[in-house]
Curated annotation (Swiss-Prot):
It is found in: Virion. Residues 219-258 are annotated as: Disordered. The keyword ATP-binding does not apply. It comes from Lettuce infectious yellows virus (isolate United States/92) (LIYV). InterPro entries: Closter_coat. One of its GO terms (cellular component) is viral capsid. Belongs to the closteroviridae minor capsid protein family. The keyword Lyase does not apply. This is Minor capsid protein. Residues 219-236, 247-258 have a biased composition (Basic and acidic residues).
Amino acid sequence: MLEAECDEVELTSRDVGDYLMFKTRITDNFTGDLTLNINTSNLIKFKTCSFFICYGDDKDRYELGWTSTSTSRSIFQHYKDGKYIRDFRIQDPFPILSGSTFPVVISKIIANRVAFRMSRRLNNVIVDKLKNNIIEFLFVVYLDVDTGKIKPNTILKNLDLSSLFIVFSNNGNNKINLPYEIELQTKDRGIVYTKMGNPISYNLFNKFEDLLDIETKGVDKPEDKPKPVFDDKGKQPTDTVPPVDNGKPDISKPGEKQGDIDIASKFNNIVMAKLKAQSSSDPLTKKQCDQLMLSLIKWFEKFGITKDNARLLIFQFGISFSTSKENLNNITNNIVVENDKGGFVKILKIDYLNKLYGSIPESHTHNLERVLLRHYAQEILILLRSKVLEWPRKLARNKGIFEQYAYMACDFFDTAELELTEAETTALTTVKSWTMNHYKKKRQIVNSSQLE
């Protein structure tokens, strides 16, 4: 067991960096759909990290995920018999935006086939079902390997695991309780520390530190530091570091690395990026959206509109008049709704938008209406299917969507994050293919001289 004697640990120069690996077995027998939502706003705090969702075992598996070194890349690759298949590898560089999410989807389809999809980067790559029907999730963060000192617990204290990723099953209705394994690699000592954990729900803990209980032994004991001085207002300085919780001893043992993925050996001289606080221009969190929704409902109640109708009205404004910024200043868009006294009230969308933006004290560069509705997109989709909400038929005609699927024309829908039926996916794919071919023909004609 390691002893906690100081806050910092001395590192020496070496070829391969230290890393922290978190691995969890999602299922031993994959039989349905699985969606893994990655919160990339937390991942971009680190200069180098990787996540993969793996289908199969250590001998034969497909790996779908994302890695960030000098550039961010989505990767889909096949690992078999101790090596990666060279003719089966898909890479796609792309920028990671603050506050964005990155869905990874695996679907079981008929005839023993499995389909992979990754947000807007990879669309339905179909492979044969493997003999070992196992799904695992792998997350790796690389630590500082420069000579000097680092604070090993800083990365653990600042990484919120519950907001890093959320696993959904059964069409997003249930969270999964998963067993986990954590591996801390320290090459300078030639030791690998591992810890196994019992199944736990991700909403029961917040930090990696709550799982690890890892205490790091330092080379030299630091001098006693003076206590922080409080200002006149009694506030503690922001640069003070919270104490390390040295509660339970670590269950540690030396041994070789688990599995065949040796990601750390591919990188040299990796430096952990400085952590940054979330800026005021980031999109809203789920908690902020729920609070904002309650505030808007109370505003509608002043007009005698019930809570249920107010919620539907918020959804209908975005559906009927779209959420594009071009419509923000339209003073004619309105909905007439019945109040609790049997009368009718005319609500202008511009008044609703003024209330929406006025409810947020910080300034935002994002389209707040679109961000808000995307948090409730799955609920809205169900209401549209049931025809509780009016369909955007005009927008559907402009997009060329079939009449029976006109409800899919909402401009705030991110179809990569929705649970769609096969028919809905086919309808949208047909429209997308037609649009791409239509504009491809236009791009082939540069000027009128080409027609001669």
